[in-house]
C-alpha cells in the first residue's frame, strides 16, 4: 500500500444499468475504479423495476474494489458520497425493510394515474413543481401502488430515493438532498419543501418523507459493518450527495446561465442552466 500524497474521496453513482465507484484525489486524478451491473425486471410490457438490495450490494462491491485498486492508505479517503438515478421511490416498512422492488423512471404503467392527477390539479402541478407530470414521475407511480397494491401501501413507513437508501444503509438517516425530491412532482424547489396538499393525496404520514438537506452536507459517518466490508475507517464522513444529472452538470462545469450539458446514457438528457 502506498500513499497518494493527497487527500482522496470515494464517489459512487447508482446508474440504471450499473453502479460505478471511483477513488479520486484532490488533484482530480482517478486512483481506482470499479463497475457492477444489475438486472432490470420487466414483468409486463411498459414495466421496469429493480430491487434496492442490488444497488447496495453493487455499491459495497465496487467501493471495495476501487479502494483496493487505488492502493492508498484508507485513512487518506476523507469522505464518501453517492449520486444516483431519480424518480424512483424505495418503500420501507416500520423495521426499515424494503417492501417491494422500486419502480424505475422508465416505467409507464401509471399513465391512468398521471392523467387523473393532471385532471384534478391542472396547471397547479407545473406552477408549484416546475415540471410537467407524466408516468415517469414518482407521484403517479406511488398512486399506482396505492390503488393497485393496498396491502403493500398500508405497510409504507418511509419513502427514500436510490442514493438515499444506499446511504441509509451505511449511516442511518432519513434524509435526501434538495434536488432529488424535484423528480417526484411532490416538492416545491423554490421553497425547498414538500407540498403538503400534493403529499396528502397519498395519505402517508408527514414523517414518511425524507428531510431535505444540501447535497454537500455531511450527514454522518460510515457504519462499522460497512466500513469493515469495503475497507474504510468507521469514522469516515458521509456526504448527502445528489442526483446523477445534477452531479454531471456540475462536474462538466456548466455553472453559468446558458451553459448546457448533453448526457448520453440509458436515457439522454439536455440540461441548460437558466439562473
Predicted regions located by residue number:
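Gly/Ser/Thr-rich active-site cleft segment
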Residues: 14-16, 125-245
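N-terminal glycine/serine-rich phosphate-binding loop of ATP-dependent small-molecule kinases
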Residues: 1-101, 127, 155, 227-228, ...
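Glycine-rich phosphate-binding loop of actin/hexokinase-like ATP-binding domains
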Residues: 89-114, 155-156, 160-195, 236-275
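Generic alpha-helical structural signal
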Residues: 56-60, 64, 111, 115, ...
